[in-house]
Amino acid sequence: MTALDSRNWGLTPAMETGLFQKPQDRIFIIELENSIVSFINSNTESFQLRPMNSYYRLLSHQIAEYHNLNHVLARTQDSCVILFKGENFQKIEGKPLLQELQLNKKPEECASSSESIEKSNNNRIFRILKRKEVGNECDYKIDGNTRTPNSNLTANSNKDQKIEIDDKSSTDLEQERIEKERLYEQRKQEIFDKLNKSEDDVKSTNSSGSSDSDNEWSDWLNGDDSNTQTSNGSVSSSSPFNSSVTTIQVNKPQQQFYDSRRGRGGRRRGTNNYKDAYRGQSRRNKENGGYQSGYSSPYLVYPPPQMGGNSLPTYPLMYNPAGPAPGPAPSPMVMGNNTVFMNPYMYNMNPQGSCSFGTPIPMYPPYQYQYQYQYNTQYHSGPYSNTPSYNSNNYTRSSANKYHHFQGKNSYSGAIPKRSDDSNSNKNEGIRRASVEGSPSSRDTDSVEMKFDKLNI
């Protein structure tokens, strides 16, 4: 191994560091140099190196320059270096290989020198430089057509261009940093408090508005259905609507839910029973379900206004016999000189018989449904469940009631009403007598009927 000074052979600092201070880089340099020597001794004109990082590409360029070779980057891959000999290539005789060189300094001295440089860099104190603001006002002396700057201006500009070193100590800088952080946190907290306050105000306004409406509805639903008499003797309605008479349906007719699953020949798999339209009711909300087509509601028809004799005749809605009719066929009516069929009116007619232009058309409360139902559940299974006018067999088994809503189990006799025929007529008569014996007196029944009349049902 040749012990020579590396500066005599044109070694770069990167080559010196890789050869004498970093063993991993020294291994790379030795392998690369062996490949270059084999390329020089061969007849090939170019040699492409393997892909490598930028630091090793730098060492490759410098090592190729050391051995008098030309070097370029590949066009297809920027991470590859291509070495070629060229026309004027000559092998330098007597030049040692890089792996044979050795520095005059010992490695310990090199390591100590590098450590001292690092320590000096770490101990260096950096100060914050502050540039003084330059004034915009300038003083000039104008003599004729020439302008000469004042000597004070020149001195000030020279002083402004110089960078002054801040004399603040590290403690002052730390205190300033702490103060800035405190102001930042304070400002951030104020912003968040303002946002939270605005959100709380919005929620409070929404809750107050909804609570008022909820209280109004709850008072109306939980209160008595009948009109209450005030201290002045006037009758006030508990309904939130501004109406003189309001019909309230407490117990609406039970909606019919049908099985929406696909039919397999009209039968269920694994059973011999046909589809049951009421079997799926236990899995659904019966009270607040959506609108179903099975619910039989009457047609809603607005009555045409009565016109004068000199005006054009009115053409009301005609009855379509092909359409679905929830009840019996409507009765004929004479409109003009023609006899037409009208659906039952949902609203009362104007008692005055005619209306004039410019006068608002009054609104009238609707009729009750054409099918009578038991609207009050408190009289279904209570002591007044067998009142003849509200819970008789003729009432529940009427032909007008398309969907028969059975009363369920009797609270007194424990019997379920069945279809009346010749074989069971005696049994039903006995059950009816037993229930009448357990019912209250006629006096109580009359008071109950009076309450029903007040409820306007």
Swiss-Prot record:
Annotated GO biological process: galactose metabolic process; RNA polymerase III assembly
Localization of this protein: Cytoplasm
Molecular function, one GO term: mRNA 5'-UTR binding
Keywords: Cytoplasm, Phosphoprotein, RNA-binding
Modified residues (Phosphoserine): 198, 435, 439, 447
Keyword Phosphoprotein belongs to the record: yes
InterPro entries assigned to the protein according to its UniProt record, in alphabetical order: R3H_dom, R3H_dom_sf, R3H_domain_containing
Keyword match RNA-binding: yes
Biased composition (Polar residues): 145-158, 248-258
GO cellular component: cytoplasm; nucleus
Cited PROSITE patterns: R3H
Biased composition (Basic and acidic residues): 159-181, 418-435, 443-457
Ranges annotated as biased composition (Low complexity): 226-247
Location of region: Disordered: 142-181, 195-291, 406-457
UniProt cross-references to PANTHER family, sorted A to Z: CAMP-REGULATED PHOSPHOPROTEIN 21 RELATED R3H DOMAIN CONTAINING PROTEIN, PROTEIN ENCORE
This protein's name: RNA-binding suppressor of PAS kinase protein 1
Organism the protein comes from: Saccharomyces cerevisiae (strain ATCC 204508 / S288c)
